[in-house]
C-alpha cells in the first residue's frame, strides 16, 4: 500500500512497485483513508509519507501497531519523507516504523529497504508503551559501557539533517544492505 498526500508521489511509487512486479497495490491520500482500506485488506508492506493531514504517518503507524487485528499489526512500514532530522528519525523508529527513506527516493534505495524488511524481518516486541519491531539494534551494553561510549561519541544535534546512510545505520547498525553492495568491487580483482 502507498500512502501519500501527493498524487504525484503515489503514482511514482506505484510505477516503481509495478516495475518490481508488484501487482496488488492500493493507494491512500492520508492515514485515515489507509486505515479504512485496511478494514477489508491487509497489505504486505506499507510505504508511508510522514506529513499528511488530517492523519499523518506517525499517527497511522501508532494506530496500526495498536490495532487488535493481529496480521495488520505486523505489516512492515517503510516511512518515506522529505525530512531527515535526527529527532524525526528517532520519532518514527519509536512509533514502530521498520525502515526510513529520505526523498527523493531512487528505485534502488526503495528496493533495498523492501528487501531488508522481507529478508531480515525484526522480531516484534510488546512493552507497556510500545508494540512494534524490536528497536534494540545492538548487543545490550552494561551501564559502564554506555557511559564510556557517551564520553567517546559526539551526539548528533536533534535538528541536524542526516544522510540516508546515517539513517540506515540507526535502523540497522552493523548490517550490510543490498544497496551498499553496489559500492564494493564485483568479480575478480587485479
Regions of interest found by a model, annotated:
Residues 14, 59, 73, 84-99, ...:
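Alpha4 helix (beta4-alpha4-beta5 surface) of REC/receiver domains from two-component response regulators
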Residues 7-26:
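Two-component/phosphorelay signaling modules centered on CheY-like receiver
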Residues 119-189:
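CheY-like receiver
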Residues 41-47:
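Active-site beta3 strand of CheY-like receiver
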Amino acid at each position: 500500500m502507498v500512502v501519500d498526500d501527493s498524487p504525484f508521489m503515489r503514482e511514482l511509487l506505484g510505477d516503481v512497485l509495478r516495475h518490481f512486479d508488484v501487482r496488488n497495490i492500493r493507494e491512500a491520500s492520508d492515514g485515515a483513508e489507509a486505515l479504512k482500506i485496511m478494514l477489508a485488506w491487509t497489505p504486505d508492506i506499507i510505504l508511508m509519507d510522514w506529513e499528511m493531514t488530517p492523519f499523518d504517518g506517525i499517527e497511522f503507524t501508532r494506530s496500526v501497531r495498536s490495532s487488535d487485528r493481529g496480521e495488520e499489526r505486523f505489516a512492515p512500514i517503510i516511512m518515506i519523507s522529505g525530512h531527515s532530522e535526527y529527532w524525526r528519525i528517532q520519532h518514527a523508529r519509536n512509533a514502530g516504523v521498520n525502515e526510513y527513506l529520505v526523498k527523493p527516493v531512487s528505485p534502488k534505495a526503495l528496493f533495498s529497504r523492501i528487501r531488508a524488511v522481507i529478508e531480515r524481518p525484526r522480531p516484534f516486541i510488546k512493552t507497556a508503551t510500545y508494540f512494534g519491531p524490536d528497536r534494540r539494534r545492538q548487543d545490550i551494553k552494561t551501564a559502564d559501557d554506555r557511559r564510556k561510549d557517551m564520553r567517546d561519541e559526539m551526539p548528533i544535534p536533534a535538528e541536524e539533517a542526516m544522510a540516508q546512510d546515517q539513517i540506515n545505520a540507526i535502523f540497522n547498525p552493523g548490517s550490510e544492505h543490498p544497496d551498499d553492495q553496489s559500492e564494493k568491487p564485483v568479480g575478480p580483482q587485479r
